[in-house]
Amino acid sequence: MLDKSKRYLVVGLGLLGGKYALELSKAGFHVDGINRSEGHLQYALEHGYIAGGKTHDFEALVAQADHIIFGLYPTALIDWFRTYGSLLKPGCIFTDVSGVKTGLVEPVQALCPAGVEFIASHPMAGRETSSVEHAAEVNFAPANFIITPTEKNTPAGIQWARELAEVLGFKHICTLTVQEHDRMIGYVSQLCHAIAVSLMCANDNSSLCEYTGDSFRDLTRIARINDKMWAELFLWNKQNLISEIDQFDSALQEMRAALVADDRDKLEQMFRLSTQRRAAFDKKLPE
């Protein structure tokens, strides 16, 4: 069980940072916040997400925090830590919410002061909208929480991350290496966003919205996207994503070839395979 006497600090009160702050506060933890936007900080204060917070002159909040949640983009997290990381006190264990770990975990762990531990994690939840105003809409219960420990992490740090996920409401918690995580994310998350975005960009006929059905809406739900965040995540994980795009393109070309050849058997074979794999996937979904 997490110690409720510990002070938590959320740096970056966006969608996920705001949700962490909300759930921790609801669970009875003392949570402070740091945010660049005064408006979003005030929203978090007024709605009880945080007990206190600042947009600047926040060194004291950092120094007294027992645990920190970084709701920042990877580049911003590294930059922030280079400036303020020395303020973290011995015994502080902190984590992030970033969707990419390669290029982030090793540099931040190398910058940690003595006695400070960074245990990286990824809450695989979110919405098409962003900002703390929509944080309450995020549902952690059906989502996956992935912990990505390295040889520099302690059993206590890993256990803290697991217990944090439980307090936040995650039902499925697992561990992967940094490399495994980024390979997996390239397929199950980033490729899906790449397909949705490409589908929306492939046709500019705005009148199509009058005729679309559920299939189009389902496939393009995630195409309404945070451009700055996803551009950064794509570029940070570009080798894995390019590999997945190539593999997807190969499958699409296989279907195209079947159409050109009027190969009904091949099309039916692909449809059966996708149906079988989707059925198996549905059985494995966490309840």
Regions from the PLM with identified roles:
Residues 1-62, 67:
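NAD(P)+-binding Rossmann beta1-loop-alpha1 motif at the extreme N-terminus of oxidoreductases
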Residues 4-7, 91, 142:
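Phosphate-coordination loops involved in phosphoryl transfer and adenosine-cofactor binding
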Residues 7, 30-32, 117, 144, ...:
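Residues at the starts of beta-strands that form the adenosine-phosphate
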Residues 36, 72-73, 97:
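Short beta->alpha hinge that forms the Motif I/post-I loop of the SAM-binding pocket
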Residues 58-88, 92-93:
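Rossmann-like NAD(P)-binding element
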Residues 80-133:
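Rossmann-like NAD(P)(H) cofactor-binding subdomain of soluble oxidoreductases
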Residues 137-222:
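Internal alpha-helical scaffold of NAD(P)-dependent oxidoreductase catalytic cores
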Residues 207-277:
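Interdomain hinge/lid region at the active-site interface
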